[in-house]
Structures are given as structure tokens and as C-alpha cells.
Amino acid sequence: MSPSLTFIHASDLHIGAPFRGLRELSEEWARRLSDAIPAAWDRVVEAALSRKVDFVVVAGDIFDSTRASYRDYLRFFDGLKKLDAAGIPSYLCTGNHDPLSLWQRDFFALPASATMLAADRPDFALYERGGEPLAIIGGRGYPNKVWSPQENIAAGVTRDAAEKALGPRAAAAPFA
């Protein structure tokens, strides 16, 4: 029987993004909607834990860089720590709203099982279960807020490039 794996892919969380005009609705709706964005991340973590997924991918725009606060970072990193404690690795990349150059790296360090994919080049990670390579995770984050429309962000994110970067074990991974 061939191996299977489960994972959650989330993107565009925009933690810290403001909702505009909420006070015009009501104080209650303003509070609910303001809590909705970070609560979405909490639900991703809860789903990963309850379903015992193999890994979680969070691909781009984790934060709204101009608005993310210490509290926003704390909430996100607390979720990463819960995943880490459960043995669920996470793979992250930055987006145009939270380029790596604007991350508040002095707030927190990534847990041991969290991998931040590079922003200056295609990058890869190998997911293994019990020493068996099962999946190649590849991507490229945003190094800054502007990406040239002439440059293909996915250029170089290929299986061949992953196998070169990760070595011969990557060739055995059935999923890429």
C-alpha cells in the first residue's frame, strides 16, 4: 500500500489587518470582525491538532506587515509552538504584505519544527515520517513588498531543483 499524508494549507491570513468602518455597524460587530482574522489562525491550529495532520503549510501574507503588533506575533507563534509540541511541522513563506524584510524577528524565534522558506531564491524542505521521505515542500517568499512583473516567482521551483537542493533522499519522496 502506498503511503498517504494529510496536511493543511493556509494562506493570506493577514493577521493584524484592520477592518475599516466597523464602528459604523455596532460595537459588537466591530469586536466580532476584529477577532475573526486571528481566530482563523486558531482554527487552523485546532484543525491540525484534532485531525493529527502530518504538517501545516502557511503560504504568504501571514501578517499585514504595516499593522501586525507584538500581540499578533505572539498569537501566531503560540500556534506554531502548539503544532511543534504535537510533533506537527510547519512550513512558512512570506508574501507581499509581510515580506521577510519587514518581519519582526526580534519578537520570537521559530520553533524547531517550523521551517521558513527563503525569500531570495527557490527553497525546499523534505517532509519525512519515520525516516521515510514522503513530500517535498517547495516555494519562495517575498523578500520585499515589490515583485517585478517580469520575474516569475515560481521560476526554479521544480522537482529537479528540489532534488538537487535536498540530495538523493528527496528523489524517493512520492509527493512534491
Model-derived segments and their meaning:
Residues M1-L74:
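N-terminal active-site segment of His-dependent metallophosphoesterases
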Residues F55, T66-A176:
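His/Asp/Glu-rich metal-coordinating catalytic cores
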